[in-house]
């Protein structure tokens, strides 16, 4: 028949309905469409009202006439086999259930009620596929359409009594996918949307979850996996409490922007996140209980953003961590460009290793490690205005320039090694509970700057300015080597031996003192105007020229001056 209309219940062992302008083989029901004759097409190939239910062991419906739809408003139940529907137009389906598989192919598909397959469900639509209420299957569900719109529940791995099994896979393939409801798989969930996936307020959940495609909008949405979660997209918007979470491993990569402001991306055992630009600000979270790895050309973690894990590795072009946090037992941060950590925090329980072109840690920025701390910069470390580098273990800072003025602090409960072409510690503090080493070019420790070590101090620089209340102090031995030292009004002191190898020393009103022996080798030594050179042990001075007018060179032991 060309069309069929059902207004009453229809019962059969096997129900086959074939409509359209066809030649149908009686044995196989193979339909061969006839050429169009110009006659008017029916509005619907099959029209089943709410009273027109179909009940059979197996059901097969075929509508071959192009553009002519199938409307099934009544119940459809296949108690012993499959339901197969082929429509060349739009299919509108109300309630359907099969003991076996459900297979649908149509120009467009609209599921308005509850649809269940006791086997697998396979639906293909040339245009759109809409699910308004529920689609469930005991086994696999495979959906393919140009556009998929789910406002209800699509769930694979559901027994007829609604218990969950462990073998339901859900696969969706589309150009665009909109999910305002729930997509659930008891085993693997895979969603591919080549253009865009809109999951605003929706949820995707599976034992494993894979999302692949164009732009992913997960604002207020959830992607949840017990096992691996893998997301690959051109861009991702995970704002407004968006959640991507795996109880195992999560891999999230975008070719463009990843916006996680106020969102969460979590892989409890392992997290890997990669993007061109990654914005994790406004209390965004990238976290793992084990390993977290982040890569981006630009990472923004400001405004209480957090990147955390047992082992955290961030490899970026630039990093804006103003007011943000990077926290781990072991923390490695590598930036080819600049890092801004003003009011930010890098914190490690074991070791913190930071490498970049430059670091702005001023204004109470903090790098803290309960173990070792290493900072390596090609350019400037700006640690002014109460910036802090703190470590319980050894601390090594290698920079082009250090600006530690106005309350900047480099502190180690172990050794502190600082090297730079320029070290500006005016009004700052360098302190080590073990040894302190400062090497490089110009070292400016004026204006109340303090550099001290409890187990010895070694300073080898091109020049040292320790004037105007500067303090260079050692609880042990102090070794000083410089071409020029200015110590007017400053203090250089050691509780152990002090040895200074200098080009020149100008310390009018300054102090160069040791509680043990003091040795000075210099070209020019100016100790005038109340300068003091003193030691409890012996003093040995080798100099070409000594000016001690109104100065003092004294020892409780021997004093030897060779000038």
Question: Would you name each region that the model predicts?
Answer:
Residues 1-413, 417-475, 479-536, 540-563:
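Extracellular and secretory-pathway beta-repeat/beta-biased strand scaffolds
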């Amino acid at each position: 028949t060309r069309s069929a209309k059902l207004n009453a219940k229809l019962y059969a062992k096997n129900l086959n309905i074939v409509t359209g302008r066809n030649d149908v083989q009686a044995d196989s029901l193979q339909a061969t469409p006839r050429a169009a004759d110009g006659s008017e097409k029916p509005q619907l190939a099959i029209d089943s009202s709410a009273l027109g239910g179909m009940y059979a062991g197996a059901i097969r419906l075929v509508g071959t006439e192009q553009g002519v739809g199938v409307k099934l408003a009544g119940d459809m139940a296949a108690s012993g086999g499959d339901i197969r529907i082929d429509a060349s137009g739009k299919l509108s389906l109300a309630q359907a259930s099969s003991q076996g598989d459900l297979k649908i192919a149509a120009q467009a598909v609209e599921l308005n009620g509850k649809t269940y397959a006791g086997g697998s469900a396979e639906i293909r639509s040339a245009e759109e596929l809409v699910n308004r209420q529920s689609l469930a299957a005991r086994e696999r569900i495979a959906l393919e359409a140009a556009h998929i719109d789910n406002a209800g529940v699509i769930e694979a791995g559901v027994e007829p009594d609604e218990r969950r099994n462990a073998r339901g896979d859900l696969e969706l393939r589309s150009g665009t996918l909109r999910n305002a409801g729930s997509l659930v798989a008891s085993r693997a969930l895979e969603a591919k949307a080549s253009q865009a996936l809109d999951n605003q307020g929706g949820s995707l959940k599976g034992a494993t979850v894979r999302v692949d495609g164009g732009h992913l909008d997960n604002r207020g949405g959830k992607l949840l996996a017990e096992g691996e979660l893998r997301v690959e997209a051109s861009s991702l918007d995970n704002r407004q409490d968006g959640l991507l979470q795996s109880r195992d491993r999560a891999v999230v990569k975008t070719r463009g922007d990843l916006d996680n402001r106020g969102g969460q991306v979590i892989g409890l055992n392992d997290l890997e996140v990669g993007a061109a630009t990654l914005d994790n600000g406004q209390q965004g979270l990238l976290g793992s209980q084990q390993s977290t790895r982040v890569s981006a050309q630009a990472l923004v973690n400001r405004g209480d953003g957090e990147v955390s894990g047992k082992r955290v590795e961030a490899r970026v072009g630039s990093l804006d961590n103003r007011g943000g946090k990077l926290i781990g037992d072991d923390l490695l941060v590598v930036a080819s460009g600049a890092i801004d950590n003003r009011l930010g925090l890098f914190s490690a329980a074991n070791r913190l290793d930071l490498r970049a072109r430059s670091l702005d840690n001023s204004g109470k920025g903090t790098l803290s490690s309960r173990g070792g701390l290493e900072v390596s910069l090609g350019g400037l470390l700006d640690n002014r205005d109460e910036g802090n580098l703190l470590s319980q273990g050894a601390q090594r800072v290698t920079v082009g320039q250090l600006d530690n003025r106005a309350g900047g602090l480099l502190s180690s409960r172990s050794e502190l090694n600082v090297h730079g072409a320029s070290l500006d510690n005016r009004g700052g503090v360098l302190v080590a509970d073990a040894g302190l080493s400062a090497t490089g070019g110009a070292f400016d420790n004026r204006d109340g700057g303090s550099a001290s070590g409890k187990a010895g101090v070694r300073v080898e620089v091109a020049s040292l300015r320790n004037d105007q209340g500067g303090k260079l102090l050692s609880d042990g031995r102090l070794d000083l080597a410089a071409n020029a030292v200015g110590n007017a009004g400053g203090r250089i002191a050691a509780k152990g031996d002090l040895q200074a190898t200098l080009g020149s020393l100008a310390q009018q009103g300054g102090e160069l003192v040791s509680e043990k022996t003091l040795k000075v080798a210099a070209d020019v030594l100016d100790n005038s105007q109340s300068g003091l050179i003193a030691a409890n042990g012996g003093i040995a001075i080798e100099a070409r020229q000594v000016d001690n007018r109104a100065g003092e060179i004294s020892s409780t032991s021997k004093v030897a001056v060779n000038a």
